[in-house]
Amino acid sequence: MNTPEMKAMMQQANQMDKESKKKSKTTTSPIPEITKSEDTYWKNTWASDKDNKLKNWNKGTADLVFNYAYDSRNNDVNYIKVGVIKADGSIELNPKSDVPILQPLHNFKNSNNFFDIHNADSYQYTNETAGFKLNSYILVYQNEQQIGTLTLGNSVKVTRNLLTPGDVYYGDEGYIVSWVYVDEACAINAKEHWTGDLSNTGTPLIVETNVVYALNFKLGWNLVKTEVMGTYEFEDVPEEDRSRYKKHEHTLITSIPNDATYFFRSVGNH
């Protein structure tokens, strides 16, 4: 999904990584020394409290939108409004509208931004031609301009890692919630056990990962919980290789978990 908003998120992540690395000249610091990563994860980030209100919010009222297509001819993102952030930071998110442009469910194997299935034959679809759209973020707009993204989960790390190319394999534990719209009942199921050698030094570094998709969608809007479970931690390695996940589990949920937090991350100069 090479859309302007994803490009902005990638640019933001790359810039934060560069700033983080400038603070330390060593590239092999032990994993427990993680303060620079904490700074990266929280930079330009607001988190909600138990009342779904972003703490210290100072950006005024903003629209929450679900993007479903990109018009390359007009350099325009197509979206529907699904909620609002009020001036006091209160979040009201309740998708109800139909999504007008969808892709067939079976295309998920080519558009899965979690990149956790190695063999596309692992996917099993029910009603594979049903229209489908999944986003693990909500765009935040003011005056027809994107000012940031809103994610939902129980970890500031996971909600960033799983949206950042190159970081999706990290083993920080927790979950992110995705919003899915389908125009017919359908399903994605997959199970994959993968073993691989991550070493680039000649000394084997074998890991095993397990990935499960158990997604039986009802017509309309659905919530998917993607949980990172178990961690391979690699000490004395560059920060960008500090860990790998042991398991990803993708399941449907009927409501937002009680321990979930909204994370707003600004983009550009906003």
Q: What residue spans do the PLM features occupy?
A:
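Short, ordered, surface-exposed loop/turn motifs in non-cytosolic proteins
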Residues: 41-76
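Local beta-strand/beta-hairpin segments that build beta-sheet-rich folds
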Residues: 75-84, 147, 212
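Long, low-complexity intrinsically disordered regions in eukaryotic proteins
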Residues: 96-198
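Sec-dependent signal peptide cleavage junction
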Residues: 1-35, 269-270
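Extracytoplasmic cysteine-anchoring/structural motifs
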Residues: 176-270
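Acidic, serine/threonine-rich, charge-biased low-complexity segments
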Residues: 29-47, 87-93
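Glycine-centered loop-to-beta-strand initiation motif
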Residues: 62-64, 81-97
